[in-house]
Amino acid sequence: METANYTKVTEFVLTGLSQTPEVQLVLFVIFLSFYLFILPGNILIICTISLDPHLTSPMYFLLANLAFLDIWYSSITAPEMLIDFFVERKIISFDGCIAQLFFLHFAGASEMFLLTVMAFDLYTAICRPLHYATIMNQRLCCILVALSWRGGFIHSIIQVALIVRLPFCGPNELDSYFCDITQVVRIACANTFPEELVMICSSGLISVVCLIALLMSYAFLLALFKKLSGSGENTNRAMSTCYSHITIVVLMFGPSIYIYARPFDSFSLDKVVSVFNTLIFPLRNPIIYTLRNKEVKAAMRKLVTKYILCKEK
């Protein structure tokens, strides 16, 4: 990369999702509804698992961590996007952009690693039921969660370190509603091929390796379920849980691979996929995981009755 004298860009201008006021109002209502479902839904999951003495297995501990990451991940972009619907000139400072990039990749990569840990937990519970409590003990569970967070942190540091060394001299317009790394790299005043290659390898490696590990574990489990088909309610319940996990994996990794594991060229679907990845995807935790789990639903009803309805009386 050449080291020349450039006029340093101090802010970026975001184009947003639409410039039409009527469309912006409709989008605001839709995305506000999504965010107001994500926030209390995942907070309720965390509170339920934390306060209910029966939800102490590793699966629920991992689910609470996933709920926290969903709140964090969606809150990195959603509040600013909602405000920008009513702002004519959508601006984010250079430092704010770097911070947004860091936390977005930190939370996103941590969630990918955590989903892999959850697949390991499901595999152990089904294939090694007699040794499950010994294998997935509290210590190992905490270590795996900590490693997921550390992996996300390292990945995010790599992405940000590559961005801050690039020169930005204008233009400073990002064709997005948030500080997307693919857009930022595209407007740098230098040959960004080496940085882009490392970013793609980092994101692609995490996405592809985690996806392969997840699909292999689920393929093994589905093959096992096929042999045990008709063996009872527990098998059907485990199979239903497995399909829920597979749905999550497809919704998480599909958009991420599309956006970050390819050359950073602009395509017409980029904004749609980004919205799905940053705002719609976090909806799936309360919907797919929680509403399909009888124990969590029962604990939620008990929590609402005890702490909310009783206070109103």
From Swiss-Prot:
Keywords: Cell membrane, Disulfide bond, G-protein coupled receptor, Glycoprotein, Membrane, Olfaction, Receptor, Sensory transduction, Transducer, Transmembrane, Transmembrane helix. One of its GO terms (molecular function) is G protein-coupled receptor activity. It is a multi-pass membrane protein. InterPro entries: GPCR_Rhodpsn, GPCR_Rhodpsn_7TM, Olfact_rcpt, Olfactory_Receptors. It is found in: Cell membrane. Glycans are attached at residue 5. Residues 1-25, 80-100, 159-195, 261-271 are extracellular. Disulfide bonds join 97-189. The chain crosses the membrane at residues 26-49, 58-79, 101-120, 140-158, 196-219, 238-260, 272-291. Residues 50-57, 121-139, 220-237, 292-313 are cytoplasmic. It comes from the Eukaryota. GO terms for cellular component: plasma membrane. Belongs to the G-protein coupled receptor 1 family. Odorant receptor. This is Olfactory receptor 4M2. It comes from Homo sapiens (Human). The gene is OR4M2.
